[in-house]
Amino acid sequence: MNSDTNAFKDIRISCVELSRIAFLPTESFDPNSLTLLACLKKVEEKLSAYEDDSLSPKFADYVFVPIASLLKQPALGESQTEYVLLIIFHLLRTCWSSNGKFSEQLGQQLFPLITFLVSSDKDNQKLITRSDEFKYAGCLVLHQFFKSVRSQRYHKEFFSNSKPNLLPALGHSVTILLKILEQSPQNNELQFKALASLEVLFQDIISDGEMLSFILPGNVSVFAKILTKPGRQIHYKVCVRTLEVLAKLLVLVYDDFSLDIKVNKLTDIRELSDTKLKHEINQSFMFNGPIVLLRTDGKTHRDTSWLTATSGQINIALEAFIPKLLKRNNESIDEALATFVSILLTRCENSLNNCEKVLVSTLVHLERDPMSKLPSHLVKLKEVVNEDLHKLSDIIRFENADRLSSLSFAITILEKNNERDTMINEVVRCLFESLNESIEPPSLINHKERIIEQSSQLTTTVNFENLESTNALIALPRLSEDMSLKLKKFTYHMGSLLLERHILNDVVTELISEQVDSPRTQKIVALWLSTNFIKAMEKQPKEEEVYLQFESDANYSSSMVEEVCLIVLEFCNELSQDISMEIEGKGIKKSDEFAVCTVLFSIETICAVMREEFQPELIDYIYTVVDALASPSEAIRYVSQSCALRIADTLYHGSIPNMILSNVDYLVESISSRLNSGMTERVSQILMVICQLAGYETIENFKDVIETIFKLLDYYHGYSDLCLQFFQLFKIIILEMKKKYINDDEMILKIANQHISQSTFSPWGMTDFQQVLNILDKETQVKDDITDENDVDFLKDDNEPSNFQEYFDSKLREPDSDDDEEEREEEVEGSSKEYTDQWTSPIPSDSYKILLQILGYGERLLTHPSKRLRVQILIVMRLIFPLLSTQHNLLIREVASTWDSIIQCVLCSDYSIVQPACSCVEQMIKYSGDFVAKRFIELWQKLCQDSFILKELRIDPTVHNHEKKSISKHVKFPPVTENALVSMVHMVLEGVKITEYLISEAVLEQIIYCCIQVVPVEKISSMSLIVGDIVWKIRNIN
């Protein structure tokens, strides 16, 4: 009471002011009066401050007096009506909300009034034009009215058939809320309040399916419209709330228990003679499907005819909005939809029997079954699976990955409930056929662009460190990686089902055996499927599961694994040989790429499954794996790396080199047989990969193969591509040989320095002052004894000169390039015997001989018209000379024999050849020392007369306008020219180191002048004192 008193005192003045306007005569009353609006706002503001159920009904009676007077006026403005509705809402909230405070009579009087104030016309046309604030006020008052009625004891009978006078207002209120829900897509709060009002009305007040059945169609229609709208128009939370309200409405109307439904199934054709059944059979039902009968008294609205008609409408509505909701791919919507469907399958299983398919299909597509309802609907689930299987080709072609995942989910449910006897075999058949249809036929692939051979740097570089993991994904032709991954997971799951049923062996054997005369594409698909089936065996049983295995099961499993793996391996071997023969000399097509990747994937999987038992089988497949490592296809290389790592991890403790070395004999045999059969393509790349992976040790096992390659160079030296591949291989061999026998370049220089004079003051091979004294002593002794002809000559070495001139002349008489080819071959053959006692090179004589052979064939092919081949040969020669310098006696012979051929390349007009040729000559000068001093002097003369590259520079140091800055480059050269000039300058400067005291100052000045136009002056002037003086002279005197 105290609250009422305080509230009365607080609101009395506002009510008085409102009454003054409300009780005005009709002719004086202004329905749109702003004063009236202000008074209503004051009252509403006062009421909004009071807590729920804090005041008595008497207080409401007092406040309602001016409101009742207002309602007697002929009209009321929109804003004024809005605040009247808000005032009624507050009165319901504060005074009429709890049990016993809101009389049934008052409710019956107030409800029609509220619905009229919200919408005065039955069609709600005016309501559409109202503001959202007005609509919200209407929803608020209706929601609060329903809540207040719910709190009263009479709430169950408030809208009963015994009180028909309220039914029109009830129908009107429902249409108002549905109209607001449908027409306010941008106002979520308004929609939530409308849905909350309907929920209270349906579930807590009416809760009578019979009565709700009258208003069901309109509700379902509006709800379906809401749920079918796109996401940009309807918030996902509104969809979730709508599904909740719709589920409650459908359960109230179609609940199997309340309808007292009895389900009969036809078991005998004679049952059709039953009169009742004749009447109930409807064409929309399957002939052998369930026929629903209702026990009715003839007075109820919900009879069989009603059920047949309305359930069909419900099915149409479900088929309309469920696919739209699925496409939104929203987690909250998916969860609400799964709950919605599960509730209908639980409470309305029989009454909405015709909706069973769409409901089951929804759970399958959602891959959710929160109430575990699918096991009780296996027949319909199987129909859904069969339909998806028949559409599997389209699912794959259009890359509907989600549909494939849901199919796997459905098959799992069937498998868990012993409904897989024929289903799993049907799945395998459809999967095989669908993949074949989805992958492009070979006739269309043949005209596709072939995979272009990449540079040797790419195709022969195998980087296992960058491989994130094994089990590389094989993308199916014409399908994305995502879809390929989904298919792989799907197939793997089917394999696990086959394994559980112990029929994996039979299915794989049958699948492969049927492909004997099939096109290669089908064979590859069969192999891809079989391998993914077998991959299920790779999963090891958990430790606790091992104890549950019976011995017979374990033995069967072991024998089954080995048998099916061997079948797949044999199939891989046949396919691999066919592919190798087909692509030899033709290049790899995209279809070949997928085929090779699948074979490698199969080998990797079998290795993972068989583990140590795969060791005896490896010899037949190691060449296939290594061959793929050298493939021009990046995809094939990636998969082969994954396969090689798997084999190494399983059998060789993760060591790729050990894997290669342990099987090198089989690799030699495979490569030799291919060479002998004329299959020369890519042999060099394979050897490169082997050498890179396992080091030079493998080449020692490939000596016969290397000899065969040398013979092929004799026979096929006109084929530039083949020769180029061989010299790319030679480069790898040389690098690996250096890696094994030579620690670093300093080691080579240390060995070479024993024979090379590095001091400019000892050009005749003398390295210290004592050698000078010894020479002088011997010459003096000869002069003292020259008159005594009977004296015995002084003891000296036969090979040691008696004076400077003889020593210098002996150097010039050493072997040079006039030696013919036959002498070279004899020297190569006899080198190991002749120098056995004095062999100083860390490189064994057999390996050294390989270097000499490579050098000899390279010199011969330097006249080949192919520019790429000549460049590659020069690159290889540049690598050879430092290694040859470790045995100086043989180095000088090779320098002498190859000098002229390489100099011809230096004088070439093609600068891309000049650059490696100059680098090669630089190495020859560096490691031969004063042996090539005379040749270098002659070379400079040739350069001045015949060189094209030297013409890019100014040779005469006296013509530069006496400007220091003119010494630098007078033109900006293209990259090719620039590289060639730099290489030539380095070559010339290396020659200057051994000839600066043998050539005239004018020539030396000419050489230095050319060099400082290309490389920094500081680098040249720091070479020696003489060179520094020449640089100073050029810059300051000329």
Curated annotation (Swiss-Prot):
One record GO biological process: positive regulation of DNA damage checkpoint
Gene Ontology cellular component terms for the protein in this record: cytoplasm; mitochondrion; nucleus; TTT Hsp90 cochaperone complex
Location of the region described as Disordered in the Swiss-Prot/TrEMBL record: 810-840
Keywords: Chromatin regulator, Cytoplasm, Nucleus, Phosphoprotein
Extent of Acidic residues compositional bias: 816-829
Subcellular location: Cytoplasm; Nucleus
Transmembrane domains' residue ranges: none
Chain positions with Phosphoserine modification: S817
Keyword Endoplasmic reticulum attributed: no
Quaternary structure (record): Component of the ASTRA chromatin remodeling machinery complex composed of at least RVB1, RVB2, TRA1, TEL2, TT1 and TTI2. Component of the TTT complex composed of TEL2, TTI1 and TTI2. Interacts with TEL2 and TTI2.
Further comment found in the protein's record: Present with 721 molecules/cell in log phase SD medium.
Family the entry assigns: Belongs to the tti1 family.
Stated name of the protein: TEL2-interacting protein 1
